[in-house]
């Protein structure tokens, strides 16, 4: 968490230090991000995501994420590594030259590898599992004349044969330094319904760098 706060404090002054004007939204990009989470099973998240426009305000979306965590339960120590690949299609609806509504439908393939070691044993147990999730998203974005972009998005998760339900609210603030380079900060709140030991509420905070083309 301290690492994220330091990076955010370094980034915020840059968000307002330039008057570079961005000419509309560009949905052709590749970005790399780092986030932290207060979810019990995930501490750090590294991800790469991208978008390619295919015409008529449609885009192909992709993301690869690796999440890691470790924790102690009574008499045992555990670690987890999640890897997820997301593919989807997005559609934007322009309200004016600086504001648009965003929407997408994505499929997430999710792998979990977990280790468990009891304090009374020298043996480490290894387990793995797979699951898949469908994610529908809708949001709004605005780009100011100074190149500051604000994104607000609602993500609706339907996992495990569409029965498990979770919702997310995500807010991003991004500064475009040129037509090809931007840096952003983000905060996400995950609301699990119904909540369980492996599907609880959590918050993520992060930073990312975007390269447009």
What are these regions (language model features)?
Residues 1-27, 213:
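Cleavable N-terminal export/targeting peptides
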Residues 19-72, 85, 204, 210-212:
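Short glycine/proline- and aromatic-enriched beta-strand/turn motifs that initiate or cap beta-hairpins
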Residues 25-30, 56-62, 96-101, 144-152, ...:
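Repeated loop/turn-to-beta-strand initiation elements of outer-membrane beta-barrel proteins
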Residues 26, 42-46, 79-85, 109, ...:
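Residues that define the transmembrane beta-barrel architecture of outer-membrane proteins
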Residues 34-38, 64-70, 83, 93, ...:
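Transmembrane beta-strands of outer-membrane beta-barrel pores
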Residues 49-51, 88-91, 137-141, 170-172, ...:
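Outer-membrane beta-barrel architecture
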Residues 93, 173-175, 201-213:
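Outer-membrane beta-barrel "beta-signal"
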Residues 98-159:
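Detector for outer-membrane/organellar transmembrane beta-barrel domains
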């Amino acid at each position: 968490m301290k690492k994220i706060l330091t990076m955010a404090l370094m980034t915020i002054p840059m968000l307002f230090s330039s008057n570079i004007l961005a000419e509309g939204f560009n949905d052709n990009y590749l970005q790399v991000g780092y986030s932290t989470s207060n979810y019990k099973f995930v501490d750090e998240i590294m991800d790469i995501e991208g978008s390619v426009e295919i015409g008529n305000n449609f885009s192909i979306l992709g993301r690869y994420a690796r999440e890691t965590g470790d924790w102690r339960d009574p008499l045992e120590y555990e670690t987890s590594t999640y890897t997820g690949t997301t593919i989807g299609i997005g559609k934007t609806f322009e309200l004016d030259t600086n504001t648009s509504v965003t929407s997408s439908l994505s499929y997430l393939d999710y792998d979990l590898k977990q280790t468990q070691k009891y304090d009374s044993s020298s043996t480490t147990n290894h387990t793995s599992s797979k699951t898949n999730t469908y994610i529908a998203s809708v949001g709004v974005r605005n780009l100011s004349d100074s190149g500051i972009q604000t994104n607000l998005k609602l993500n609706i998760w339907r996992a495990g044969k569409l029965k498990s339900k979770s919702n997310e609210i995500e807010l991003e603030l991004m500064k475009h330094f040129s037509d090809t380079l931007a840096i952003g900060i983000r905060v996400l709140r995950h609301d699990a319904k119904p909540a369980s030991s492996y599907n609880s509420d959590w918050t993520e905070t992060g930073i990312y760098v975007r390269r447009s083309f």
